[in-house]
Amino acid sequence: MTTLATLIFLVTLLFVLWQPKGLDIGITALTGAFIAVITGVVSFSDVFEVTGIVWNATLTFVSVILISLILDKVGLFEWSAIHMLHASKGNGLKMFVYIILLGAIVAAFFANDGAALILTPIVLAMVKNIGFSKRAIFPFIIASGFIADTTSLPLIVSNLVNIISADYFHIGFIRYFSRMIIPNLFSLLASIIVLWLYFRKAIPKTFDDNNIKHPKDAINDLKLFKISWIVLVILLFGYLISEFTKIPVSIFTGIIAFIFLMLARKSNALNIKQVIKGAPWNIVLFSIGMYIVVFGLRNAGITLILAKILEYISNYGLFSTILGMGFISAFLSSIMNNMPTVLIDAIAIGQSNVHGMLKEGLIYANVIGSDLGPKITPIGSLATLLWLHVLTQKDVKISWGTYFKTGIIITIPVLFITLIGLYLTLIIF
């Protein structure tokens, strides 16, 4: 059974990453799940258990992306980016830092995928219009994609990984925020420093800001633009209310997304059908299917091996526990994608004989590693693969070799510093 469960997992993962002839990841994952069920690797009760774990996470994620797609069509993100350019006042370094800060804000509230896939094309268009060379463009593109993941820690909704882990361990919105806001700030600061050190010679010292358009010119629907700010406030309150009412956060985000869609349906700035079609609905099928396959690894006893490893490193104290878990999840995410990694690790943490603060350290370090680890390799997350594809369509080609070289140099120090932020949070607060 162990061999069969492992084989089903590896073949499913291979087809998810390869996507031959555009094969949808949702179909691939469900096929793997179907094979796991009919071969007896997982039971029907496992299917219901997995669905119970992931439905809230995936629907929340889809709702947030829907909202972000509307905001993008309205022009909110471009409006924000133009403000950042004007605030830079022709200083290349300031522009670099401000774009990173904007990316961090977008990632926090609209998820890492939204930040990377929506903000990157906007930034790319801007630096091209300014007249930057290809060498000067590269740092801004990498920074836009990198910061989307490294600062997707603070809120449960900032990353699908966060939602799944929080749901699995029944962690509320406020408690999660209280544990991850400091690590996120550590990650943000470390990202700015490391990215600047790595790209300092390529970032232009100055640029001509005379031809940058006015922020208001980016707004495609002024009425909907004003409504957007109200929607954002209501969305934040929805997150907080879910903490106290125990109502799944997907209920709030879903209702808000639906109302926003209804308000936007008469706008000339966007096509509602295209927005709905552009949402990552296949993520729902992928999550359910992939996690059923992962449960096969649990049933075969493979996650118990990892649980024993976690018990071993926990014997060396909180600092070693956090570093060990963080780098294990980062490594696994980089070689087999962060989506299965976070649940495999979560199951192992639950199976381990680790309790109290040490267990808490494992839980949050797993999230950090699964959020940051994917930046090491192109296959670390589905969003990165799509991000690279979008850039290729816009005539910006980044080879896997170049990505890996850049990713590993930048990610390792940022991951280490972020884990230190988690350690300090747990021992001080």
UniProtKB/Swiss-Prot annotation:
Gene Ontology CC terms, in alphabetical order: plasma membrane
Source superkingdom: Bacteria
UniProt KW keywords: Arsenical resistance, Cell membrane, Membrane, Transmembrane, Transmembrane helix, Transport
Pfam families for the chain: ArsB
Molecular function per GO: arsenite transmembrane transporter activity
Segments crossing the lipid bilayer: 3-23, 25-45, 50-70, 99-119, 137-157, 180-200, 222-242, 244-264, 275-295, 316-336, 372-392, 408-428
InterPro entries recorded: Arsenical_pump_ArsB
Presence of the UniProt keyword Transport in the record: yes
Subcellular location: Cell membrane
One GO-annotated biological process of the protein: response to arsenic-containing substance
Membrane topology category: Multi-pass membrane protein
Presence of keyword S-adenosyl-L-methionine: no
PANTHER family xrefs: TRANSPORTER ARSB-RELATED
Record's function text: Involved in arsenical resistance. Thought to form the channel of an arsenite pump.
Family designation: Belongs to the ArsB family.
The name this protein goes by in its record: Arsenical pump membrane protein
Species in which this protein is naturally found: Staphylococcus aureus (strain MW2)
Gene name tied to this protein: arsB
